[in-house]
Amino acid sequence: MSNTVATMINKRNIMRNYIKIGVAGPVGAGKTALIEKLTREIASKYSVAVITNDIYTQEDAEFLTKNSLLPPERIMGVETGGCPHTAIREDASMNLEAVDEMVTRFPDVEIVFIESGGDNLSATFSPDLADVTIFVIDVAQGEKIPRKGGPGITRSDLLVINKTDLAPFVGVDLSVMERDARRMRNGQPFIFTNLMKKENLDGVIGWIEKYALLKNVEEPASLVR
């Protein structure tokens, strides 16, 4: 994370005491699983709320209600009714209203996760909606995914490459993915995870604490640049 990004976060938080973390990525990559695992680990330490986006349903919100440790009233589903790009970028009004409602309901909130609907590699968040962004891809999509680029790969503040346990079953060389991610990310961090077993989940939490919450902690060793 650059000093520019840290300065930007500080400026945005002058009038509020919470951070907005956008989580995007293709369908099935592990966005909801990441938020579920994160909230289980950090809910006892931080005040957390979640906004999910689905086109026609509230399936992700319902999953988190059943599986995370957050009470149902801290999880809100937004039905976008159209392209998931629009709801997080060109016209983020529904999500901004959801965030406002959530932080009004819970004035102590410190972290608001905003999960986009499943998308391709071009998803980006409006800077008004997300202070920092995490983009999730998975090994099962193939080792060529990092080198395909797209804003999600190249511009997100943290890239999560999930489902590393599937690599031998889908013929993926993780070293190739690492090489290509290094090249495409140009110094920005990424991390390999197996969220089913919580492998390197602590690294994602460490990144959030250091670069989103701006805590004075060491950079996680599992981050790759």
From Swiss-Prot:
Task: Detail which positions bind GTP.
Answer: G25, P26, V27, G28, A29, G30, K31, T32
List GO BP terms, alphabetically.
urea catabolic process
| Single GO molecular function | nickel cation binding
A single Gene Ontology CC term: cytoplasm
Q: Pfam families of this UniProt entry?
A: cobW (PF02492)
Matching SUPFAM superfamilies: P-loop containing nucleoside triphosphate hydrolases (SSF52540)
**Which keywords has UniProt assigned to this entry?**
Chaperone, Cytoplasm, GTP-binding, Nickel insertion, Nucleotide-binding
Name its cellular compartments.
Answer: Cytoplasm
The cross-references to InterPro entries, in alphabetical order and at most eight, read:
CobW/HypB/UreG_nucleotide-bd, P-loop_NTPase, UreG
Going by the entry's taxonomy, the superkingdom of the source organism is recorded as Bacteria
Which interval of the chain is the signal sequence?
none
Fetch the HAMAP family from UniProt: UreG (MF_01389)
- Family the entry assigns: Belongs to the SIMIBI class G3E GTPase family. UreG subfamily.
Query: What is its quaternary makeup?
Result: Homodimer. UreD, UreF and UreG form a complex that acts as a GTP-hydrolysis-dependent molecular chaperone, activating the urease apoprotein by helping to assemble the nickel containing metallocenter of UreC. The UreE protein probably delivers the nickel.
**Role this protein plays:** Facilitates the functional incorporation of the urease nickel metallocenter. This process requires GTP hydrolysis, probably effectuated by UreG.
What is the recorded name of this protein? Answer: Urease accessory protein UreG
- Phylogenetic placement of the source organism: Bacteria, Pseudomonadati, Pseudomonadota, Gammaproteobacteria, Pasteurellales
